[in-house]
């Protein structure tokens, strides 16, 4: 087994060799518009997966992914020979070509973010003249908490009537009315 750093270096080199061969050496019209985006090599360096994208002939043309896949399959042997000559490893990895869907995912994510921004802008327009439904501060309670007359602590008012009782706060829930002996 090779270490991960060697596998990454080999994958990078394979991607560069395949991209160069597709662009300059292999004259298959089905490979026009094919771009190599990435390559991954297994830990034993015997298999390589090469990721590619396909562009249309113009900006408005749909890419011919099936034609590009067929052209890559036809050129697989030549590309593997070039990879073997260019890398100098004892065993030339077998090449597998996979259509890279990252660009489609990025495009879909951009669309979702644009929709979210539009929804945020609509919400901001609605908020401009909006007022709260109730009071400005619904949690404010005028005069319900007062200082405790009990020494050393705060109290909690248990009712707001004329017979309001201040209950001292105690720590640990000790109310003093249990039957345990005091130490």
Curated annotation (Swiss-Prot):
Instruction: Tell me the Pfam families matching this sequence.
Output: RBFA
What GO cellular component is one of the record's annotations?
cytosol
Location of region: Disordered: 132-183
Q: Which InterPro entries match?
A: KH_dom-like_a/b (IPR015946), RbfA (IPR000238), RbfA_dom_sf (IPR023799), Ribosome-bd_factorA_CS (IPR020053)
Q: Which UniProt keywords apply?
A: Cytoplasm, Ribosome biogenesis
User: For this UniProt entry, what is the primary localization, expressed as one broad class?
Assistant: cytoplasm
User: What is the annotated localization of this protein?
Assistant: Cytoplasm
For this chain, one GO molecular function annotation is: ribosomal small subunit binding
One GO BP annotation of this record: maturation of SSU-rRNA
Against NCBIfam families, the record matches this protein to: rbfA
How this chain assembles, per its entry, is: Monomer. Binds 30S ribosomal subunits, but not 50S ribosomal subunits or 70S ribosomes.
Role noted for this protein: One of several proteins that assist in the late maturation steps of the functional core of the 30S ribosomal subunit. Associates with free 30S ribosomal subunits (but not with 30S subunits that are part of 70S ribosomes or polysomes). Required for efficient processing of 16S rRNA. May interact with the 5'-terminal helix region of 16S rRNA.
Q: What is this protein called?
A: Ribosome-binding factor A
Where does this protein come from, organism-wise? Answer: Mycobacterium tuberculosis (strain ATCC 25618 / H37Rv)
């Amino acid at each position: 087994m090779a270490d991960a750093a060697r596998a990454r270096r080999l994958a990078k080199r394979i991607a560069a060799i395949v991209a160069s061969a597709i662009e300059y050496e292999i004259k298959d019209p089905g490979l026009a518009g094919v771009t190599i985006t990435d390559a991954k090599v297994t830990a034993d360096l015997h298999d390589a997966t090469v990721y590619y994208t396909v562009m249309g002939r113009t900006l408005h043309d749909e890419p011919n992914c099936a034609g590009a896949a067929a052209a890559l399959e036809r050129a697989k042997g030549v590309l593997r020979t070039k990879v073997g000559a260019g890398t100098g490893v004892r065993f030339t990895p077998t090449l597998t070509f996979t259509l890279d869907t990252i660009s489609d995912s990025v495009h879909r994510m951009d669309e979702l973010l644009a929709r979210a921004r539009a929804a945020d802008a609509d919400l901001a327009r609605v908020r401009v003249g909006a007022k709260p439904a109730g009071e400005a501060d619904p949690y404010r309670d005028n005069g319900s908490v007062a200082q405790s007359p009990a020494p050393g602590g705060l109290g909690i008012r248990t009712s707001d009537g004329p017979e309001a009782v201040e209950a001292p706060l105690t720590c640990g829930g000790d109310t003093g009315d249990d039957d345990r002996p005091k130490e």
